[in-house]
A protein has these predicted regions:
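Mature, structured domains of secreted/extracytosolic soluble proteins
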Residues: 1-314
Length: 314
């Protein structure tokens, strides 16, 4: 609380007593936040969930007092878009991890965002920025920056439309988690193959890469290809599996018309795009596969779900 002097004491009323003071008393968190990044979060009604989260884990003062920071600030709608409507399910440790994943340790205006598209957060892990036509910027393939360069005394805010969540594991771990989901489980065939003794070396090779892209056939894709796969040798099935991963962290916006992607088995897949959105892959059998879900982000890469199994030259 700030200081104020009592200038008239003991003014009696029917339901209490009044002491007049010569200044407005402010809670300490209001006083130290004025003019800072924290002020925007505290006093803008669009950021009430973010403000509550920062206060819950005692990070509000940090955001107000640390100099030269950049905050990618999710508004209330951004939390809802990420499926977060309450903070009740978060431990303080998890909430701190999520919040610090939204902060860079330098003042970075929109014109200064790294050309390479990689920025390290205070949480310690990187975020990945994609620069699209018309000046649009995506983070980790799914979150868009919708307002930029709100400058305050100790840093700058960019408002985002979806809360950032640090990846829960590498892309093999994430595929396994999706296969074991309580609702909408998928990729069970793919992950069972990767977990088997026969192909665990492929899973290990994927895990070992720092930047890799996995085109993951869903269960329906494997069912549709069961006749073909049943006639393959174990070595040929291994060749099929390595034909679904490529080196490099390629988000959907990195997949462009006419591109040839070299897979881990050294064979290529051709990319076709329709209206810059629909992505179609053509394998060595000239069969076409649709990318049906994009930018599932992992610690060492990204997953795109596909609706057919890619078949290489065998």
């Amino acid at each position: 609380m700030n200081d104020a002097t009592v200038i008239a004491a003991d003014i009696q009323s029917v339901n209490g007593v009044i002491h007049a003071v010569d200044g407005v008393l402010l809670p300490s968190y209001v006083e130290y936040s004025l003019g800072t990044v924290a002020e925007v979060v505290l006093f803008d009604s669009d950021f009430t969930i973010l403000a509550a989260a920062l206060r819950q884990v005692d990070l509000l003062e940090t955001v107000a007092t640390v100099n030269d920071i950049t905050v990618f600030a999710p508004d209330n709608a951004a939390f809802v878009a990420a499926g977060i409507t309450s903070l009740d399910g978060f431990s303080d440790e998890d909430l701190t991890t999520v919040l610090t994943y939204h902060v860079l340790g330098a003042r970075v205006l929109s014109t200064q965002l790294p050309e390479g598209g990689i920025a390290e957060t205070l949480e310690g892990r990187n975020i990945y920025l994609g620069y699209l036509f018309g000046g649009r910027v995506l983070i980790n393939g799914l979150t868009e920056i919708k307002a930029v360069d709100i400058e305050k005394s100790n840093g700058v805010i960019h408002v985002i439309d979806r809360t950032l969540v640090p990846p829960a594991g590498d892309i093999v771990d994430i595929a396994i988690a999706l296969a074991n989901a309580d609702e909408g489980a998928d990729f069970t065939v793919l992950t069972s193959l990767l977990a088997s003794d026969e192909y665990s070396d492929i899973a290990d090779a994927v895990r070992a890469q720092d930047n890799i892209t996995l085109f993951a056939p869903n269960d329906a894709a494997f069912e549709a290809a069961s006749g073909v796969i049943a006639g393959l040798t174990p070595e040929e099935i291994g060749e099929v599996l390595t034909y679904h991963a490529s080196l490099g962290r390629n988000f959907s916006y990195d997949l462009v018309q006419g591109q040839n992607i070299t897979m881990l088995n050294a064979q290529t897949v051709n990319v076709t795009t329709i209206n810059g959105e629909t992505i179609i892959l053509q394998d060595k059998s000239a069969d076409e596969t649709n990318v049906i879900q994009v930018n599932i982000h992992g610690s060492n890469g990204v997953i795109h779900a596909i609706n057919k199994v890619l078949i290489p030259n065998l």
